[in-house]
Amino acid sequence: MARPRNKADLIVAATENFEKLVKMIEEMSDEEKAKDFDFSGDEKKQEAHWGRDKNVRDVLIHLWEWHKLLLQKKKNNRDLKNVKIQFLEEGYSWKTYGAMNKVFWERNQEVLESDALELVKKSHSEVMELLEGFSEAELFEKDVFDWVGGSVLGSYFVSTTSSHYDWAMKKLKAHKKLVLGK
């Protein structure tokens, strides 16, 4: 699916990708869920996240933490037009956000997979509700919110929803392929 460039396409992509992701998780066997992710034998999977996430819970928690970033920033800055704020957690930049992702992973190791799924379902609904409240112009025209930098607000929603869900599905498919030996 192409990257959404308008509100209607974003809503469809986020909704469809989330539903596919949840279905994929619900259809995973106990064996697939129980076995730790191990992509160390694949030279193509060298990015940090391939080594960081060890199971379905870790993937779900990653999505949930990024939902929280978006929800928190927008709740606190809904009416801010000419103010620059930090989107990422304090102390991190777009060059160092990998370290932030590692912190997300570390602080959620005690969360159960079932709880992680409920957390991400709830936060997805909240993100979609937040998304609905923005106009097409607020989402996809530049210079509406200074805090998004040279980007548009819609790109934050795309990255936090449809694109992130696609990333999660690719990771789960790769794990499933390894477990099943296909």
Task: State the predicted function of each range.
Residues K23, D30, K68-Q72, D79, ...:
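A generic secondary-structure boundary signal that marks alpha-helix termini
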Residues M1-A13, Q46, K68-L119, K177-K182:
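Short, helix-capping/interhelical loops that line the mouth of catalytic, cofactor-
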Residues A14-L21, I25, V56-K74, S93-G98, ...:
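Alpha-helical transition-metal enzyme core signature, strongest for iron centers
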Residues Q46, V83-I85, S93-K95, L139-E141, ...:
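Short, intrinsically disordered/low-complexity patches at protein termini
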Residues S29-H49, V103-R107, V111, S125-V158:
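Acidic interhelical loop/turn segments
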Residues T15, E19-D53, N82-G98, K173-A174, ...:
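Short N-terminal secondary-structure initiator segments
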Residues R5-A8, V12, Q46-W50, K54-R57, ...:
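Short, solvent-exposed segments of well-ordered alpha helices
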Residues A137-F140, W167-L178:
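Long amphipathic alpha-helical segments
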